[in-house]
Amino acid sequence: MWYPLFKYVLLGPLLRLLGRPVIEGLDNVPRTGPVIIAANHLAVIDSLYLALVVPRRVTFLAKQEYFTGKGVRGRINRWFYSVSGQVPVDRTGGDAAAAALTAATRILADGGVWAIHPEGTRSPDGRVYRGRTGTLRVAMATGAPVVPVTISGTDRVNPRGSRLLRFGKVRITFGAPRRYPPAEQRHQVRAATDELMRELAARSGRRYVDHYAATFPAAVSRP
């Protein structure tokens, strides 16, 4: 009930007004069956735009803190993430990564759409950074196709460090889905992930940085 209400009534019209999204390649998203949407990450609002434009229900993994926060803000977060169907993941323990992959696998086993930003966090400067291997580990284990998605303009609508949304021009491009056969060696998963991230960089016209975004700026200097 709440998911379509947010999408078509409460948030959708505002997102369209602010970002005037231009969508390309949406037919590349399978109409049925499990699918992984792998997108670059520029702004917090990226997930809302993906949910807005994809005709199927999209599920993200959300950190458990969003469901256990205190005070008014905590209650609002808990309500929003619960009614929108997001899945809580405990990221504090040693098995945090395994818990996330298990949750993603369950979404796909139910024939759902799992959306993920392989970079793991927002790009600090608009470039595309090295991806975590979990996305393709799940793809290889489940056989679900991966749709590469490039996003641009959301960092203007939702600038880093600002609580105010602004007008901008959002563009979202969906590439052709591809399947990844199981890998026998860990380095094969790493290589496939690097290839995916380089493709996202090339499609978006942005530079690829072979470091994790979380290490910026300690390990990576600006161009």
Please annotate each region the language model reported.
Residues 2, 98-223:
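Non-catalytic C-terminal accessory region of glycerolipid acyltransferases
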